[in-house]
């Protein structure tokens, strides 16, 4: 059974949980190559900069973590399953109640349009998932996350496994040894997400 203590210990050692929709089990993943976002070189796309400048979305932090994780746990378009199991949702809700898991949300006309969630430990933020209901809402939420991490002087934004969307946003892959070096340095920091 997945629990908060084991999840936190796993993150400290470079692992993260992933549910298998086929057998319902949760497995620990530690990829040889890790997707991370270099915070010092991140630059939002022109579209995202325009949306932020024009205040198209109302950006909030931790306003409705439960709704964000519920949307993230839904299967994506053209997919019938998700890696975010009920067991994972329950643990992250508990992590949120402990002040360790956070969400960044975009609202349009008072409705949740997109967002993301993850865990903050020391100077590391472990991005878990994002979703959108309106075009570019998750990208604007991501931009807000990066701005918050820079403001608080975080060192590491872990995106776990590379995919085309993360690459488009600016993620790069590093090998496991380099990831563990960056993680150790980030975990030494005593800072808060908010």
Curated annotation (Swiss-Prot):
Keywords: Acyltransferase, Cytoplasm, Transferase. It catalyses: N-terminal L-lysyl-[protein] + L-leucyl-tRNA(Leu) = N-terminal L-leucyl-L-lysyl-[protein] + tRNA(Leu) + H(+); N-terminal L-arginyl-[protein] + L-leucyl-tRNA(Leu) = N-terminal L-leucyl-L-arginyl-[protein] + tRNA(Leu) + H(+); L-phenylalanyl-tRNA(Phe) + an N-terminal L-alpha-aminoacyl-[protein] = an N-terminal L-phenylalanyl-L-alpha-aminoacyl-[protein] + tRNA(Phe). It is found in: Cytoplasm. GO terms for cellular component: cytoplasm. Its EC number is 2.3.2.6. It is an enzyme of class 2 (transferase). InterPro entries: Acyl_CoA_acyltransferase, Leu/Phe-tRNA_Trfase, Leu/Phe-tRNA_Trfase_C. One of its GO terms (biological process) is protein catabolic process. The keyword Chloroplast does not apply. Gene3D superfamilies: Leucyl/phenylalanyl-tRNA-protein transferase, C-terminal domain. It comes from the Bacteria. Transmembrane segments: none annotated. GO terms for molecular function: leucyl-tRNA--protein transferase activity. It holds the Pfam family Leu_Phe_trans. Functions in the N-end rule pathway of protein degradation where it conjugates Leu, Phe and, less efficiently, Met from aminoacyl-tRNAs to the N-termini of proteins containing an N-terminal arginine or lysine. Belongs to the L/F-transferase family. This is Leucyl/phenylalanyl-tRNA--protein transferase. It comes from Prosthecochloris aestuarii (strain DSM 271 / SK 413). The lineage of its organism: Bacteria, Pseudomonadati, Chlorobiota, Chlorobiia, Chlorobiales.
